[in-house]
């Protein structure tokens, strides 16, 4: 039954909290629905460790600077340590009608130690407090995500080691183009992921280079605080040099969301190929049963749902980035409540990226490669045509002339149901006197691959060098 809003303010205020920390200038309580709308506790409570760590260091600084007494400092730190222990043991559930995690912890602290708890927020605002918490939280998440990326790179590299000589068709425009090895192909994703790792690590360095605590609401504080002490002991390399920027900046969230979006794009591209390769139309690989699902009606189906979900969740992370960009684009300085919306976007992206990476590495490790099917596919589509043109070039023919000549041979093959390897030598010599019987070895798939000696190419030596490079990077 829908709520009845006809009985006015008395109904709207029913159940509303009366004891807000900021309630001094207000004559009546916050509307219950507005209170629920305003609360962020149900999603920002995941930052409890960072909030407590920041508060402990803030209390130490206040005590060292004689802004609070040593006894008050000790009492606050002990109280905060007890709260952390109780949260982690389950004795203090993260279930509350508190406005946010900051108020939850401060209210709990005051409940436990009395007036000393009320002194903790001296020379601090929730504006700089939340900016600190989210930076610390995201720095920790960057480390975890970085570790997951490295595991995926390792899984890809290991799979490449097993398939250095597994020949497959390489594609452009999703048309068979040139012969390559499966190792060479999948190592492409390892190098993409390496850049993702570096982007996230670089963003993390910038994120911890500006500790915002001490910026207060926006203008700084009248107390003789030591911002550098707090920054150093919380793992930052410097403080934010402008207090307004300290509380207004969410560039680090956007930068990470951008890096996560690029990472997800790479995972999506890989997923798309896994989906294609596992289909009967390709059948280059077979995913392990533990990373596939069936159909409710078609008993023969083995669906690559994990890869499809990664592909689908990519748009979700893009949406997190675009949502936060849109939230921030029109905000005047300094802090605005709109900025509360940063957390759900960044938390959702973090959770999604971690889920995708967690499932991806073992999916690759357990994936079965089907080299015979890859080789058979490479025998079709005239993917050795470029090598035939190069054969003529090495015998003195200009490349464009050779290109046209081979194009005519391909057309002849199509008309007569042949492939380049089955055209008789007499026909080749009829088309051009430069052709000789040695061409058949030159256009074999194995030779086409082994001749690719350029750095970064698909030749065995080059692929081994790529594997060695990534192995060293991982260690």
Residue ranges and their predicted role:
Residues 58, 79, 83-86, 108, ...:
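Generic, well-ordered alpha-helical scaffold segments in large soluble proteins
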Residues 67-68, 92, 283, 398, ...:
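Conserved hydrophobic residue
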Residues 134-135, 139-142, 146, 161, ...:
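Charged, flexible cofactor/metal-binding loops and thiol motifs
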């Amino acid at each position: 039954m829908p709520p009845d809003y006809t009985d006015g303010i008395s109904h709207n205020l029913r159940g509303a909290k009366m004891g807000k920390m900021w309630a001094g200038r207000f004559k009546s309580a916050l509307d219950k629905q507005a209170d629920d709308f305003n609360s962020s506790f149900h999603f920002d409570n995941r930052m409890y460790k960072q909030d407590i760590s920041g508060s402990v260091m803030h209390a130490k600084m206040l005590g060292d600077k004689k802004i609070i007494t040593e006894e008050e400092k000790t009492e606050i730190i002990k109280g905060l340590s007890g709260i952390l222990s109780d949260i982690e043991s389950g004795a203090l559930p993260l279930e509350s009608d508190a406005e946010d995690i900051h108020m939850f912890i401060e209210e709990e602290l005051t409940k436990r130690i009395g007036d000393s708890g009320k002194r903790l927020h001296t020379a601090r605002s929730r504006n700089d407090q939340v900016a600190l918490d989210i930076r610390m939280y995201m720095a920790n998440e960057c480390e975890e995500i970085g570790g997951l990326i490295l595991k995926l790179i390792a899984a890809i590299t290991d799979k490449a080691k097993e398939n250095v000589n597994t020949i497959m068709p390489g594609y452009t425009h999703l048309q068979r183009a040139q012969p390559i090895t499966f190792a060479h192909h999948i190592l492409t994703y390892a190098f993409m992921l390496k850049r993702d790792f570096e982007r996230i690590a670089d963003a993390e360095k910038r994120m911890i280079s500006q500790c915002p605590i001490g910026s207060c609401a926006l203008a700084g504080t009248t107390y003789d605080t030591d911002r550098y002490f707090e920054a150093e002991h919380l793992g930052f390399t410097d403080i934010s040099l402008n207090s307004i920027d300290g509380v207004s900046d969410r560039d680090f969230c956007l930068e990470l969301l951008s890096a996560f979006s690029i990472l997800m794009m790479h995972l999506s591209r890989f997923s798309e190929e896994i989906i294609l390769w596992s289909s009967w139309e390709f059948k280059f690989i077979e995913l392990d049963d533990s990373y596939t699902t069936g159909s409710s009606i078609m008993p023969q189906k083995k669906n690559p749902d994990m890869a499809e979900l990664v592909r689908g969740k990519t748009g979700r992370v893009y949406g997190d980035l675009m949502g936060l960009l849109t939230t921030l684009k029109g905000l005047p300085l300094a802090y605005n409540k709109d900025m509360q919306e940063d957390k759900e976007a960044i938390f959702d992206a973090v959770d999604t990226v971690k889920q995708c990476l967690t499932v991806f590495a073992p999916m690759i490790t357990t994936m079965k490669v089907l080299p015979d099917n890859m080789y058979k596919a490479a025998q079709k589509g005239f993917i050795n045509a470029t090598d035939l043109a190069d054969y003529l070039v090495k015998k003195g023919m200009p490349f464009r002339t050779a290109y046209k000549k081979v194009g005519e041979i391909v057309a002849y093959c199509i008309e007569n149901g042949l492939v380049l390897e089955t055209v008789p030598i007499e026909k080749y010599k009829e088309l051009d006197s430069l052709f000789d019987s040695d061409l058949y070895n030159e256009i074999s798939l194995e030779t086409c691959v082994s001749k690719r000696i350029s750095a970064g190419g698909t030749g065995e030596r080059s692929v081994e060098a790529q594997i060695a490079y990534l192995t060293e990077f991982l260690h």
